Amino acid sequence: SNYTTREDLYNLAENGMIERRRRAGSLVARRSPEQELVTLEIPDIGLAIGGRDRAYSYRLLHKALREPDAAIYNEVALAGDDRLFAIDGVHLADGRPVGVEHRLLNAASVPEGLQVDFTLTSPGTWLLQEVSWTRGEYRITAEGASEQDAEVLECAPGQACLVIERRTWRGEAPITWARQIFLSSEHELVARFTTGGR
């Protein structure tokens, strides 16, 4: 529900894990030396759904090898001088849509991705199993479903959703950017933290 999403984001902000900014959304907070080390893992969505005793499946909606859109900074930054492999799909639990995923792969960093049959496995699962990465970045927001995403999610436009944008790199080479839109009642974020021995 919208209340649950707001409450979760409030709790993350209260614990210093995210910064909430008017008109900019919620961003992962910068860590000062005095703060705890907080880790958000990259989850395998299929395993997470299966862990709740639900049957997971992924449906590929669209894939294309293309040039980056010069007007979109994230695409240009991800592609550099290379092309992008765009993949759109939907995550399902017990046959019902719970999340839409829009993903871009740097075709030069992950050329083997062009040969993968994403009707058999989700891009996220394949990446976690086959592609090493050294650093990542999260951006987590609460948003209303767009008309296009609402149609795929079988919900009303504007329904509360948890939106996760994630980028990963191997060294300085960009690997992937993903935007995942989940129905707010269908996804959770789990963070583990330590106090640094204090």
Placement of each model-derived feature along the sequence:
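N-terminal helix-turn-helix
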Residues: 1-29
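Short, charge-rich binding segments
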Residues: 19, 50-51, 77-80
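Short acidic-hydrophobic sequence patches enriched in Asp/Glu that either
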Residues: 20, 41, 119
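Short, cationic-aromatic polyanion-contact patches
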Residues: 27-41
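Acidic/proline- and glycine-rich, intrinsically disordered low-complexity segments
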Residues: 45-47, 121-122
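Histidine- and aromatic-rich ligand-binding microenvironments
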Residues: 47-56
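C-terminal all-alpha effector/ligand-binding and dimerization domain
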Residues: 57-198
